[in-house]
């Protein structure tokens, strides 16, 4: 978000580990640790030093188990989907100019489309005009295939403009998709269960992505291979190049 020009003010999560990561990457922001049900909009406003209506954008991603394509009893009445209503409670109290909500693609078919319609209606009831769209992470330089539904809207009458893809298939007009090799091809090979600790990079960056991810770092850290049992090692040996567990 900061790379896109935003100044991050406050974050929230119920997991302390997530809070430590947030504080490390956003040292000038405040973090509220705990379940969202324990907080009111005024808690976030006080932490941000703002009044209702002054925040430019509120971003949320309520846990999406209730909307999963694997959940056959899904909809906004699912207990795990109630966190969406908590998110809307905070939106109502903070009154941000813009709102962004992220969820799995299964939300579009949950309840025959009723869940997605209910989300849009909930925003509209608070004065927001909202649109939804599936965005593909690989089209924006992320080295993995990931689809997410983004609900984006505002209450200030501004046009809703979706970003154009920055990456595409090789040979097209856009830079090619970032591959796994582009992302981690400079990391040393490890044996099963091996952890070499911190060590200097053995090669210069081999791709633009690696150059950007390294920054000023001179050492490889947190690079370890989990120890797998013999049966899992055997399974991995039978996955062909470019394949997955489905090919075993």
Model-derived regions: residue spans:
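Conserved radical SAM core fold
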Residues: 63-67
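Short beta-strand element of Class I
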Residues: 8-9
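Conserved SAM/SAH-binding beta-strand->alpha-helix loop
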Residues: 15-16
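Redox-cofactor binding/interface segments in oxidoreductases and associated redox assembly factors
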Residues: 34, 60, 101
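Class I S-adenosyl-L-methionine
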Residues: 43-54, 69-248
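Short SAM/SAH-binding signature in class I
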Residues: 53-61
């Amino acid at each position: 978000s900061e790379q896109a020009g935003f100044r991050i003010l406050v974050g929230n999560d119920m997991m302390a580990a997530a809070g430590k990561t947030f504080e490390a990457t956003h040292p000038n922001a405040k973090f509220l640790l705990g379940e969202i049900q324990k907080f009111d909009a005024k808690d976030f406003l006080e932490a941000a030093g703002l009044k209702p209506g002054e925040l430019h954008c509120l971003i949320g991603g309520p846990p999406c188990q209730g909307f999963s394509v694997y959940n056959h009893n899904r909809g906004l009445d699912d207990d795990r989907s109630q966190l969406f209503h908590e998110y809307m409670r905070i939106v109502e109290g903070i009154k941000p100019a813009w709102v962004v909500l992220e969820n799995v693609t299964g939300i579009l078919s949950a309840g025959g489309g009723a869940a997605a319609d209910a989300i849009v209606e909930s925003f509209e009831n608070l004065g927001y005009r909202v649109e939804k769209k599936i965005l593909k992470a690989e089209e924006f330089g992320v080295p993995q295939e990931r689809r997410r539904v983004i609900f984006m809207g505002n209450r200030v009458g501004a046009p809703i403009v979706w970003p154009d893809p920055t990456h595409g298939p090789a040979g097209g007009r856009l830079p090619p998709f970032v591959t796994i090799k582009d992302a981690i091809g400079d990391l040393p090979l490890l044996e099963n269960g091996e952890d070499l600790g911190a060590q200097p990079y053995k090669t210069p960056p081999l791709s633009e992505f690696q150059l950007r991810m390294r920054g000023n770092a001179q050492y490889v850290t947190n690079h370890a291979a989990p120890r797998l049992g013999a049966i899992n090692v055997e399974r991995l040996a039978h996955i062909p190049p470019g394949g997955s567990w489905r090919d075993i």
